[in-house]
Amino acid sequence: MARERDALYAAGCVLYWAEGAKSRNSLKVTNADAEVLVYFARFLRTHFDVPDEKMRVNCNLFADHLERQRTIEDYWLHRLELPRTCLRKTIVNTYSKYSQKKRQNLLPYGTTALVVNSTQIVQTIYGSIQEYGGFDRPEWLD
């Protein structure tokens, strides 16, 4: 079945294989590059008809982002074409008391996770990855 699909499907599966958090019932891809998450969202919308309200966005920011938290959240939501209702609690990491604060603004928009809870989609993607890769990983499948 997987080999009959288009390039978007194949790339979406490989993207999840490489960057996704492996779970039995939840898809989660985290990245600092908005294009990665935009592509993954398009894959989910196109091939699995995932509606916006089923997508969740989790931002992970750093202390130097605190003043721009709302702007950064809006950036991710805009890029992913999702309403604010999809945003979950943003985590802002604070500096330790030992930090010299030398590593500021390395990731201007922090990192963000795109999450969809669906056992059926996870299992379909796992099966496709195994078909593309030519291997069996029974622990992935129900």
Predicted features, each with a name:
Residues M1-D142:
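Domain-length accessory/inserted modules outside core catalytic folds
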